[in-house]
Regions:
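Short, small/polar-rich loop/turn modules that mediate ligand/substrate recognition or access, typified
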Residues: 174, 179, 246-248
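Substrate-binding pocket helix/loop in short-chain dehydrogenase/reductase
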Residues: 69, 97-99, 103-111, 216
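Alpha-helical segment proximal to the catalytic Tyr-Lys
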Residues: 127, 171-172, 244
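Short C-terminal tail/terminal secondary-structure segment
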Residues: 93-96, 235-236, 247-260
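Residue(s) in the substrate-gating loop at a strand-loop-helix junction
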Residues: 142
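Conserved glycine-rich cofactor-binding loop
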Residues: 7, 12-16
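Active-site helix of classical SDR
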Residues: 122, 158, 166
Length: 260
């Protein structure tokens, strides 16, 4: 097993990419601690993991709040004793509006859940990782960090900031046995967020949702979106010893949508 007895804390793990990572990591031997806003979703994922013979714990949280970040991390350590792998995946796209119409409070909310939460949880995880001379932090960024789209300023800024944070922590942590990397997924078309975003963008562009999706997918070399499991498999690689020499990298898993 690639992650045997490596405790993983995965944010945003009630659905989509987070759920896929949690189930795959557990199958590879990791006790996983789940967190997201909706306790019902977390409980369902935990039951699926335990039914397959894995170990799981969970706590619902609003990671725009520093106190909730601290509470979730403490709960993971209380249940499993430590955090070996931190995956910062929680996300919220925010309003699909131009900059001049973007509400400041919504901008702050998106920045906080993507960027500040990742900073706070990394700050909490690093001392223990340093003491063990071992650990992995994986940040789930986005294609939006590299290829800007209109009407998503907070999301693009937060995801780009997450890449900067990845590189800084990687530079600080590498000599202490801790690896930090990021994944930039392309459109995961099966997720609720992708579908809702696509419908909203279609209205902005004055086209049907089907036309919007077709046009977007045509810009990708593979001509399709990605699945949550494809992102999870890349995450498994980056969180395992198979990627032991990879530090401070941002890996595109996007079907050929971007080349940098």
């Amino acid at each position: 097993m690639l992650l045997e007895n490596k405790v993983a804390l995965i944010t945003g793990s009630g659905r989509g990419i987070g759920r896929a990572m949690a189930k795959l990591f557990a199958k590879e031997g990791a006790p996983v601690f789940l967190t997201a806003r909706t306790e019902k979703e977390l409980g369902a994922v935990a039951k699926e993991i335990e039914a397959d013979g894995g170990k799981a714990g969970f706590a619902s949280a609003d990671l725009t709040r520093v106190a909730d970040c601290e509470r979730v991390f403490a709960a993971a350590v209380k249940q499993f004793g430590r955090v070996d792998i931190l995956v910062n995946n929680a996300g919220h796209y925010g309003p699909v509006v131009p900059v001049e119409e973007y509400p400041l409070e919504e901008f702050e909310k998106v920045i906080n859940v993507h960027l500040r939460a990742a900073f706070v949880l990394s700050k909490l995880a690093l001392p223990g990782m340093y003491s063990r001379k071992s650990g992995v932090i994986l940040n789930i960024s986005s294609l939006s960090a590299k290829s800007a789209f209109g009407w998503g300023s907070a999301y693009a800024a937060a995801k780009a900031g997450l890449l900067g944070l990845t590189r800084v922590i990687a530079a600080e942590a590498a000599r202490n046995g801790v690896r930090v990397n990021a994944i930039c997924p392309g459109p995961v078309t099966e997720t609720v967020m992708s579908k809702e975003l696509g419908n909203t963008l279609a209205k902005r562009l004055n086209v049907s949702p089907e036309e919007q999706l077709k046009g977007f997918l045509n810009s990708i070399l593979q001509g399709r979106g990605q699945t949550a499991m494809e992102i999870a498999q890349a995450a498994l690689f980056l969180c395992s010893d198979l990627s032991s020499a990879m530090v401070g990298q941002s890996i595109n898993v996007d079907g050929g949508a971007a080349f940098f």
